[in-house]
UniProtKB/Swiss-Prot annotation:
Binding site for substrate: Y216, H264
Cystine bridges: none
Annotated residues for binding of heme c 2: C160, C163, H164, H301
Binding site for heme c 3: H94, C209, C212, H213
An MF annotation (GO) of this entry: nitrite reductase (cytochrome, ammonia-forming) activity
Pathway(s) per entry: Nitrogen metabolism; nitrate reduction (assimilation)
UniProt organism field: Salmonella choleraesuis (strain SC-B67)
Cofactor(s) the record lists: Ca(2+); heme c
GO CC field: outer membrane-bounded periplasmic space
Enzyme Commission designation: 1.7.2.2
Name this polypeptide is given: Cytochrome c-552
Binding site for heme: C122, C125, K126
Catalytic activity: 6 Fe(III)-[cytochrome c] + NH4(+) + 2 H2O = 6 Fe(II)-[cytochrome c] + nitrite + 8 H(+)
Length: 478
Protein backbone atom coordinates (compact mmCIF):
# COMPACT_ATOMS: atom_id res chain seq x y z
CA UNK A 1 0.00 0.00 0.00
CA UNK A 2 2.89 2.36 0.86
CA UNK A 3 4.44 1.79 -2.54
CA UNK A 4 1.11 2.44 -4.25
CA UNK A 5 0.77 5.67 -2.30
CA UNK A 6 4.28 6.68 -3.35
CA UNK A 7 3.54 6.09 -7.01
CA UNK A 8 0.29 7.96 -6.78
CA UNK A 9 1.94 11.16 -5.35
CA UNK A 10 4.98 11.26 -7.59
CA UNK A 11 6.30 14.31 -9.70
CA UNK A 12 24.60 36.09 -11.65
CA UNK A 13 30.15 45.03 -12.70
CA UNK A 14 32.49 45.94 -14.82
CA UNK A 15 31.48 47.64 -18.10
CA UNK A 16 34.92 48.33 -19.61
CA UNK A 17 37.39 45.48 -19.03
CA UNK A 18 40.89 45.24 -20.45
CA UNK A 19 41.08 45.56 -24.23
CA UNK A 20 43.24 42.47 -24.85
CA UNK A 21 40.72 40.29 -23.08
CA UNK A 22 37.90 41.90 -25.04
CA UNK A 23 39.63 41.17 -28.33
CA UNK A 24 40.30 37.54 -27.42
CA UNK A 25 36.74 36.69 -26.52
CA UNK A 26 35.04 38.91 -29.09
CA UNK A 27 36.29 36.52 -31.74
CA UNK A 28 34.18 33.71 -30.31
CA UNK A 29 30.97 33.88 -32.25
CA UNK A 30 28.81 30.79 -32.49
CA UNK A 31 28.82 29.02 -35.81
CA UNK A 32 25.95 26.61 -36.03
CA UNK A 33 26.94 23.52 -37.94
CA UNK A 34 23.69 21.72 -37.21
CA UNK A 35 20.09 22.48 -36.41
CA UNK A 36 19.92 23.28 -32.70
CA UNK A 37 16.71 22.53 -30.84
CA UNK A 38 18.01 22.91 -27.27
CA UNK A 39 16.81 26.15 -25.65
CA UNK A 40 19.19 26.78 -22.74
CA UNK A 41 17.55 29.89 -21.26
CA UNK A 42 15.54 28.43 -18.40
CA UNK A 43 13.23 31.46 -18.08
CA UNK A 44 11.86 30.65 -21.53
CA UNK A 45 9.78 27.93 -19.93
CA UNK A 46 8.47 29.95 -16.96
CA UNK A 47 5.12 30.87 -18.56
CA UNK A 48 4.44 27.28 -19.56
CA UNK A 49 5.61 25.65 -16.34
CA UNK A 50 5.38 28.39 -13.67
CA UNK A 51 5.37 26.21 -10.56
CA UNK A 52 8.27 24.08 -11.70
CA UNK A 53 10.25 27.16 -12.78
CA UNK A 54 9.70 29.10 -9.56
CA UNK A 55 10.64 26.10 -7.42
CA UNK A 56 13.78 25.56 -9.56
CA UNK A 57 14.61 29.26 -9.14
CA UNK A 58 14.28 28.79 -5.38
CA UNK A 59 17.45 26.69 -5.40
CA UNK A 60 19.11 30.14 -5.22
CA UNK A 61 18.03 30.12 -1.57
CA UNK A 62 20.52 27.28 -1.03
CA UNK A 63 23.33 29.85 -1.05
CA UNK A 64 25.51 28.87 1.93
CA UNK A 65 29.06 27.79 1.13
CA UNK A 66 30.71 25.14 3.29
CA UNK A 67 34.51 24.99 3.03
CA UNK A 68 35.36 21.29 3.22
CA UNK A 69 39.12 21.97 3.38
CA UNK A 70 38.73 24.28 6.37
CA UNK A 71 36.53 21.68 8.03
CA UNK A 72 39.02 18.87 7.32
CA UNK A 73 42.59 20.05 6.43
CA UNK A 74 43.74 16.43 5.91
CA UNK A 75 42.13 16.66 2.48
CA UNK A 76 44.78 19.16 1.38
CA UNK A 77 47.48 16.51 1.90
CA UNK A 78 45.53 13.74 0.23
CA UNK A 79 45.01 15.95 -2.84
CA UNK A 80 48.52 17.51 -2.87
CA UNK A 81 49.42 18.46 -6.43
CA UNK A 82 45.76 18.51 -7.55
CA UNK A 83 43.46 21.57 -7.85
CA UNK A 84 41.19 20.20 -5.10
CA UNK A 85 43.94 21.05 -2.59
CA UNK A 86 43.32 24.73 -3.39
CA UNK A 87 39.59 24.83 -2.98
CA UNK A 88 36.78 22.41 -2.24
CA UNK A 89 33.34 23.56 -1.19
CA UNK A 90 30.38 21.32 -0.53
CA UNK A 91 27.65 21.52 -3.18
CA UNK A 92 24.85 24.09 -3.05
CA UNK A 93 21.78 24.91 -5.16
CA UNK A 94 21.57 24.27 -8.90
CA UNK A 95 21.12 28.03 -9.45
CA UNK A 96 24.82 28.44 -8.58
CA UNK A 97 26.18 25.82 -10.97
CA UNK A 98 27.82 28.27 -13.39
CA UNK A 99 28.83 30.79 -10.71
CA UNK A 100 30.54 28.14 -8.62
CA UNK A 101 32.58 26.62 -11.45
CA UNK A 102 33.72 30.11 -12.45
CA UNK A 103 34.64 31.09 -8.91
CA UNK A 104 36.35 27.93 -7.70
CA UNK A 105 40.14 28.15 -7.51
CA UNK A 106 40.26 24.77 -9.24
CA UNK A 107 39.48 26.28 -12.65
CA UNK A 108 42.37 28.75 -12.37
CA UNK A 109 42.47 32.27 -13.83
CA UNK A 110 42.69 31.92 -17.62
CA UNK A 111 43.29 35.09 -19.64
CA UNK A 112 42.49 33.68 -23.08
CA UNK A 113 40.34 30.93 -24.53
CA UNK A 114 43.42 28.70 -24.83
CA UNK A 115 44.67 29.34 -21.30
CA UNK A 116 44.13 27.61 -17.97
CA UNK A 117 44.62 24.24 -16.28
CA UNK A 118 41.37 22.44 -17.08
CA UNK A 119 39.56 21.15 -20.19
CA UNK A 120 36.14 22.00 -21.63
CA UNK A 121 34.79 18.86 -19.99
CA UNK A 122 34.67 20.69 -16.64
CA UNK A 123 31.52 22.49 -17.84
CA UNK A 124 29.71 19.27 -18.61
CA UNK A 125 27.40 19.13 -15.59
CA UNK A 126 26.79 22.85 -15.17
CA UNK A 127 24.38 24.06 -17.82
CA UNK A 128 21.87 23.23 -20.56
CA UNK A 129 24.25 25.21 -22.81
CA UNK A 130 26.34 22.03 -22.76
CA UNK A 131 23.56 20.08 -24.43
CA UNK A 132 23.14 22.96 -26.90
CA UNK A 133 26.86 22.96 -27.78
CA UNK A 134 26.98 19.18 -28.15
CA UNK A 135 24.04 19.37 -30.51
CA UNK A 136 25.65 22.29 -32.38
CA UNK A 137 29.30 21.13 -32.52
CA UNK A 138 29.07 17.40 -31.92
CA UNK A 139 30.73 15.73 -28.95
CA UNK A 140 34.27 15.99 -30.33
CA UNK A 141 33.74 19.65 -31.13
CA UNK A 142 32.32 20.39 -27.70
CA UNK A 143 35.09 18.68 -25.76
CA UNK A 144 37.92 20.23 -27.82
CA UNK A 145 40.04 22.84 -26.03
CA UNK A 146 40.39 24.44 -22.64
CA UNK A 147 37.68 25.24 -20.10
CA UNK A 148 37.98 28.98 -20.84
CA UNK A 149 36.79 28.40 -24.41
CA UNK A 150 33.34 27.72 -23.07
CA UNK A 151 33.12 30.87 -20.95
CA UNK A 152 31.10 33.01 -23.38
CA UNK A 153 28.93 30.03 -24.36
CA UNK A 154 28.06 28.26 -21.13
CA UNK A 155 26.16 30.87 -19.17
CA UNK A 156 22.80 29.45 -18.10
CA UNK A 157 22.58 27.47 -14.88
CA UNK A 158 21.70 23.80 -14.78
CA UNK A 159 18.03 23.63 -15.63
CA UNK A 160 15.16 22.58 -17.84
CA UNK A 161 16.84 21.28 -21.00
CA UNK A 162 19.36 19.25 -19.02
CA UNK A 163 16.67 16.77 -18.06
CA UNK A 164 13.71 17.42 -20.38
CA UNK A 165 13.26 17.32 -24.13
CA UNK A 166 11.90 20.86 -24.13
CA UNK A 167 11.39 20.87 -27.91
CA UNK A 168 9.02 17.89 -27.79
CA UNK A 169 5.26 17.89 -28.09
CA UNK A 170 5.04 15.97 -24.82
CA UNK A 171 6.83 18.76 -22.92
CA UNK A 172 4.56 21.36 -24.52
CA UNK A 173 1.60 19.35 -23.26
CA UNK A 174 2.92 19.36 -19.69
CA UNK A 175 4.43 15.89 -19.68
CA UNK A 176 7.95 15.33 -18.26
CA UNK A 177 9.55 14.28 -21.58
CA UNK A 178 12.63 13.11 -19.71
CA UNK A 179 15.82 12.77 -21.74
CA UNK A 180 19.52 12.07 -21.45
CA UNK A 181 20.90 15.29 -22.92
CA UNK A 182 24.51 14.04 -22.68
CA UNK A 183 25.29 11.28 -25.22
CA UNK A 184 28.15 9.95 -23.07
CA UNK A 185 25.63 9.31 -20.28
CA UNK A 186 23.39 7.42 -22.67
CA UNK A 187 26.31 5.18 -23.69
CA UNK A 188 27.19 4.56 -20.04
CA UNK A 189 23.66 3.44 -19.21
CA UNK A 190 23.77 1.06 -22.14
CA UNK A 191 27.08 -0.34 -20.83
CA UNK A 192 25.34 -1.42 -17.62
CA UNK A 193 22.36 -2.85 -19.44
CA UNK A 194 20.01 0.10 -18.96
CA UNK A 195 19.27 1.67 -22.35
CA UNK A 196 17.31 4.84 -21.57
CA UNK A 197 14.68 4.45 -24.26
CA UNK A 198 13.74 1.01 -22.96
CA UNK A 199 13.67 2.01 -19.30
CA UNK A 200 10.48 2.56 -17.35
CA UNK A 201 9.38 5.95 -16.01
CA UNK A 202 10.84 5.41 -12.54
CA UNK A 203 14.18 4.17 -13.86
CA UNK A 204 14.38 7.15 -16.20
CA UNK A 205 13.83 9.55 -13.31
CA UNK A 206 17.04 8.41 -11.64
CA UNK A 207 18.95 7.95 -14.89
CA UNK A 208 18.37 11.63 -15.71
CA UNK A 209 19.98 12.58 -12.39
CA UNK A 210 22.69 10.03 -13.14
CA UNK A 211 23.93 12.11 -16.07
CA UNK A 212 25.78 14.29 -13.56
CA UNK A 213 25.64 12.70 -10.12
CA UNK A 214 28.18 10.04 -11.07
CA UNK A 215 31.86 9.14 -11.13
CA UNK A 216 33.53 10.04 -14.41
CA UNK A 217 36.95 10.73 -15.91
CA UNK A 218 38.43 12.65 -18.87
CA UNK A 219 39.29 10.22 -21.64
CA UNK A 220 41.80 10.51 -24.46
CA UNK A 221 43.43 13.51 -26.08
CA UNK A 222 40.18 15.44 -26.19
CA UNK A 223 39.54 14.90 -22.48
CA UNK A 224 36.01 13.71 -23.15
CA UNK A 225 33.77 12.68 -20.27
CA UNK A 226 33.43 8.93 -19.79
CA UNK A 227 31.90 6.90 -16.99
CA UNK A 228 34.17 3.99 -15.86
CA UNK A 229 31.35 1.45 -15.82
CA UNK A 230 32.58 -1.06 -18.40
CA UNK A 231 33.31 -3.60 -15.65
CA UNK A 232 30.43 -2.56 -13.38
CA UNK A 233 29.59 0.18 -10.89
CA UNK A 234 31.07 -1.10 -7.64
CA UNK A 235 34.25 0.50 -6.32
CA UNK A 236 36.30 -2.59 -7.15
CA UNK A 237 34.88 -2.74 -10.69
CA UNK A 238 35.83 0.86 -11.44
CA UNK A 239 39.23 0.38 -9.79
CA UNK A 240 39.87 -2.61 -12.03
CA UNK A 241 38.82 -0.59 -15.09
CA UNK A 242 41.14 2.32 -14.23
CA UNK A 243 44.06 -0.01 -13.48
CA UNK A 244 43.60 -1.86 -16.76
CA UNK A 245 43.95 1.35 -18.78
CA UNK A 246 46.69 2.71 -16.46
CA UNK A 247 44.66 5.86 -15.83
CA UNK A 248 45.41 8.43 -13.15
CA UNK A 249 43.92 11.86 -12.54
CA UNK A 250 47.18 13.24 -11.15
CA UNK A 251 50.33 12.32 -9.21
CA UNK A 252 50.35 13.18 -5.52
CA UNK A 253 53.20 15.69 -5.09
CA UNK A 254 54.31 14.16 -1.78
CA UNK A 255 54.19 10.40 -2.30
CA UNK A 256 54.43 10.42 -6.14
CA UNK A 257 51.45 8.07 -6.23
CA UNK A 258 49.41 8.00 -9.48
CA UNK A 259 46.05 8.90 -7.97
CA UNK A 260 42.38 8.58 -8.78
CA UNK A 261 39.96 11.36 -7.80
CA UNK A 262 36.36 10.34 -7.30
CA UNK A 263 33.77 12.93 -8.29
CA UNK A 264 30.19 12.68 -7.00
CA UNK A 265 29.05 9.05 -7.38
CA UNK A 266 25.50 9.37 -6.11
CA UNK A 267 24.02 7.18 -8.86
CA UNK A 268 26.44 4.36 -8.11
CA UNK A 269 26.02 4.50 -4.34
CA UNK A 270 22.23 4.94 -4.54
CA UNK A 271 22.11 1.86 -6.77
CA UNK A 272 23.95 -0.14 -4.10
CA UNK A 273 21.61 0.88 -1.29
CA UNK A 274 18.18 -0.25 -0.18
CA UNK A 275 16.39 2.64 -1.90
CA UNK A 276 18.06 1.98 -5.23
CA UNK A 277 17.47 -1.73 -5.00
CA UNK A 278 13.77 -1.06 -4.42
CA UNK A 279 13.60 1.56 -7.20
CA UNK A 280 12.82 4.42 -4.84
CA UNK A 281 14.08 7.14 -7.13
CA UNK A 282 15.99 10.40 -6.69
CA UNK A 283 12.75 12.19 -7.56
CA UNK A 284 10.75 10.41 -4.86
CA UNK A 285 13.02 11.79 -2.14
CA UNK A 286 14.47 15.04 -3.53
CA UNK A 287 11.74 16.33 -5.91
CA UNK A 288 8.38 15.27 -4.48
CA UNK A 289 4.94 16.14 -5.72
CA UNK A 290 3.60 19.18 -3.82
CA UNK A 291 0.55 21.42 -4.14
CA UNK A 292 0.49 24.98 -5.44
CA UNK A 293 -1.81 27.72 -4.09
CA UNK A 294 -4.69 26.39 -6.16
CA UNK A 295 -4.22 22.86 -4.86
CA UNK A 296 -2.73 21.55 -8.10
CA UNK A 297 0.03 18.96 -7.82
CA UNK A 298 3.40 19.64 -9.44
CA UNK A 299 6.97 18.33 -9.12
CA UNK A 300 8.99 20.47 -6.71
CA UNK A 301 12.22 21.47 -8.50
CA UNK A 302 13.83 22.94 -5.39
CA UNK A 303 16.00 19.87 -5.02
CA UNK A 304 16.89 19.41 -1.37
CA UNK A 305 16.83 17.39 1.82
CA UNK A 306 13.91 14.95 1.98
CA UNK A 307 13.34 15.87 5.62
CA UNK A 308 12.31 19.36 4.45
CA UNK A 309 9.27 17.76 2.80
CA UNK A 310 8.84 14.82 5.15
CA UNK A 311 5.12 14.26 4.56
CA UNK A 312 5.60 14.18 0.78
CA UNK A 313 8.76 12.03 0.83
CA UNK A 314 9.76 9.72 3.67
CA UNK A 315 6.25 9.37 5.06
CA UNK A 316 5.06 7.82 1.82
CA UNK A 317 6.84 4.61 2.81
CA UNK A 318 7.99 4.90 6.42
CA UNK A 319 5.72 4.65 9.43
CA UNK A 320 8.30 6.13 11.84
CA UNK A 321 8.03 9.80 12.74
CA UNK A 322 10.46 12.42 11.41
CA UNK A 323 12.53 12.66 14.61
CA UNK A 324 13.05 8.90 14.72
CA UNK A 325 14.28 8.72 11.13
CA UNK A 326 16.50 11.79 11.60
CA UNK A 327 18.12 10.04 14.56
CA UNK A 328 18.83 6.93 12.48
CA UNK A 329 20.33 8.99 9.65
CA UNK A 330 22.44 11.06 12.08
CA UNK A 331 23.86 7.89 13.63
CA UNK A 332 24.77 6.47 10.23
CA UNK A 333 26.36 9.79 9.20
CA UNK A 334 28.47 9.87 12.37
CA UNK A 335 29.63 6.29 11.91
CA UNK A 336 30.77 7.03 8.35
CA UNK A 337 32.43 10.28 9.45
CA UNK A 338 34.36 8.58 12.25
CA UNK A 339 35.75 5.87 9.96
CA UNK A 340 36.45 8.46 7.24
CA UNK A 341 38.71 10.42 9.62
CA UNK A 342 40.56 7.27 10.69
CA UNK A 343 41.28 6.36 7.07
CA UNK A 344 42.42 9.91 6.31
CA UNK A 345 44.88 9.84 9.21
CA UNK A 346 46.42 6.65 7.84
CA UNK A 347 46.63 8.06 4.32
CA UNK A 348 48.23 11.33 5.49
CA UNK A 349 50.96 9.32 7.23
CA UNK A 350 51.35 7.06 4.18
CA UNK A 351 51.92 10.01 1.81
CA UNK A 352 54.60 11.56 4.07
CA UNK A 353 56.22 8.17 4.74
CA UNK A 354 56.36 7.49 1.00
CA UNK A 355 58.03 10.88 0.51
CA UNK A 356 60.57 9.93 3.18
CA UNK A 357 61.26 6.66 1.37
CA UNK A 358 61.87 8.45 -1.94
CA UNK A 359 64.12 10.96 -0.16
CA UNK A 360 66.07 8.04 1.34
CA UNK A 361 66.78 6.59 -2.12
CA UNK A 362 63.96 4.10 -2.67
CA UNK A 363 63.69 2.77 -6.21
CA UNK A 364 60.69 2.63 -8.51
CA UNK A 365 60.58 -1.15 -8.13
CA UNK A 366 60.60 -0.91 -4.34
CA UNK A 367 57.87 1.73 -4.30
CA UNK A 368 55.51 0.29 -6.92
CA UNK A 369 53.51 -2.09 -4.66
CA UNK A 370 53.35 0.56 -1.94
CA UNK A 371 52.06 3.23 -4.27
CA UNK A 372 49.51 0.77 -5.61
CA UNK A 373 48.17 0.25 -2.09
CA UNK A 374 48.01 4.01 -1.49
CA UNK A 375 46.21 4.48 -4.81
CA UNK A 376 43.64 1.84 -4.04
CA UNK A 377 43.15 2.94 -0.43
CA UNK A 378 42.54 6.56 -1.33
CA UNK A 379 40.31 5.64 -4.27
CA UNK A 380 38.04 3.58 -2.05
CA UNK A 381 38.01 6.30 0.63
CA UNK A 382 37.27 8.97 -1.98
CA UNK A 383 34.43 7.11 -3.66
CA UNK A 384 32.80 6.77 -0.25
CA UNK A 385 33.21 10.39 0.86
CA UNK A 386 32.71 12.14 -2.50
CA UNK A 387 29.09 11.01 -2.39
CA UNK A 388 27.92 13.44 0.26
CA UNK A 389 24.71 11.54 0.93
CA UNK A 390 26.13 8.04 1.23
CA UNK A 391 25.03 7.82 4.86
CA UNK A 392 21.49 7.91 3.49
CA UNK A 393 21.89 6.28 0.10
CA UNK A 394 24.04 3.29 1.04
CA UNK A 395 25.51 3.42 4.57
CA UNK A 396 26.54 -0.23 4.59
CA UNK A 397 28.38 0.17 1.27
CA UNK A 398 30.04 3.33 2.56
CA UNK A 399 31.35 1.55 5.63
CA UNK A 400 32.46 -1.41 3.51
CA UNK A 401 34.45 0.83 1.14
CA UNK A 402 36.02 2.74 4.03
CA UNK A 403 36.90 -0.53 5.76
CA UNK A 404 38.70 -1.82 2.69
CA UNK A 405 40.41 1.58 2.34
CA UNK A 406 41.69 1.22 5.90
CA UNK A 407 43.06 -2.24 5.11
CA UNK A 408 44.87 -1.00 1.98
CA UNK A 409 46.32 2.01 3.84
CA UNK A 410 47.56 -0.30 6.60
CA UNK A 411 49.18 -2.56 3.99
CA UNK A 412 50.95 0.46 2.48
CA UNK A 413 52.24 1.67 5.84
CA UNK A 414 53.45 -1.80 6.84
CA UNK A 415 55.44 -2.10 3.61
CA UNK A 416 56.76 1.45 4.07
CA UNK A 417 57.98 0.68 7.59
CA UNK A 418 59.91 -2.32 6.29
CA UNK A 419 61.35 -0.38 3.34
CA UNK A 420 62.33 2.60 5.48
CA UNK A 421 64.10 0.24 7.89
CA UNK A 422 66.29 -1.04 5.04
CA UNK A 423 67.29 2.59 4.44
CA UNK A 424 68.26 3.02 8.09
CA UNK A 425 65.13 4.91 9.08
CA UNK A 426 63.41 3.37 12.06
CA UNK A 427 61.94 6.46 13.72
CA UNK A 428 58.42 7.71 13.12
CA UNK A 429 58.20 10.09 10.17
CA UNK A 430 57.08 13.43 11.60
CA UNK A 431 54.19 15.34 10.12
CA UNK A 432 54.19 19.09 9.56
CA UNK A 433 51.53 21.19 11.25
CA UNK A 434 48.42 20.65 9.13
CA UNK A 435 45.91 21.65 11.78
CA UNK A 436 44.31 24.28 9.52
CA UNK A 437 43.65 24.54 5.80
CA UNK A 438 46.16 27.39 5.53
CA UNK A 439 48.92 25.45 7.31
CA UNK A 440 48.27 22.34 5.23
CA UNK A 441 48.38 24.33 1.99
CA UNK A 442 51.67 25.92 3.08
CA UNK A 443 53.04 22.44 3.85
CA UNK A 444 52.52 21.34 0.24
CA UNK A 445 53.97 24.56 -1.19
CA UNK A 446 50.85 26.38 -2.36
CA UNK A 447 51.10 30.18 -2.72
CA UNK A 448 47.50 30.87 -1.85
CA UNK A 449 47.93 34.66 -1.82
CA UNK A 450 48.97 34.58 -5.47
CA UNK A 451 46.34 32.02 -6.44
CA UNK A 452 43.55 34.04 -4.83
CA UNK A 453 44.77 37.34 -6.34
CA UNK A 454 44.86 35.83 -9.83
CA UNK A 455 41.35 34.47 -9.39
CA UNK A 456 39.94 37.81 -8.26
CA UNK A 457 41.49 39.51 -11.30
CA UNK A 458 39.91 36.86 -13.54
CA UNK A 459 36.48 37.40 -12.00
CA UNK A 460 36.74 41.19 -12.39
CA UNK A 461 38.02 41.20 -15.96
CA UNK A 462 37.37 38.02 -17.91
CA UNK A 463 33.97 36.89 -16.62
CA UNK A 464 32.20 40.20 -17.42
CA UNK A 465 33.48 39.82 -20.98
CA UNK A 466 32.04 36.33 -21.16
CA UNK A 467 28.63 37.57 -20.09
CA UNK A 468 28.73 40.56 -22.44
CA UNK A 469 29.57 38.26 -25.35
CA UNK A 470 26.80 35.86 -24.36
CA UNK A 471 24.22 38.66 -24.34
CA UNK A 472 25.37 39.89 -27.75
CA UNK A 473 24.89 36.36 -29.08
CA UNK A 474 21.45 36.01 -27.53
CA UNK A 475 22.51 33.29 -25.10
CA UNK A 476 21.59 35.28 -22.00
CA UNK A 477 18.46 37.28 -21.43
CA UNK A 478 19.01 41.04 -21.39
Amino acid sequence: MARKTLRARRFFSLIFPFFFITSVYAEQTPVSAKTVTVEAKNETFAPQHPDQYQSWKATSEQSAREDALAEDPRLVILWAGYPFSRDYNKPRGHAYAVTDVRETLRTGAPKTAEDGPLPMACWSCKSPDVARLIQQEGEDGYFHGKWARGGPEIVNDLGCADCHNTASDDFAQGKPALTLSRPYAERAMEAIGKPFEKAGRFDQQSMVCGQCHVEYYFDGKNKAVKFPWDEGMKVENMEQYYDAIAFSDWTNSLSKTPMLKAQHPEYETWSAGIHGKNNVTCIDCHMPKVQNAEGKLYTDHKIGNPFDNFAQTCANCHTQDKASLQKVVAERKQAIHDLKIKVEDQLVHAHFEAKAAWDAGATDAEMKPILNDIRHAQWRWDLAIASHGIHMHAPEEGLRMLGSAMDKAADARTKLARLLATKGITHEIPLPDISTKEKAQKAIGLNMQQINAEKQDFLKTVVPQWEDQARKNGLLSQ
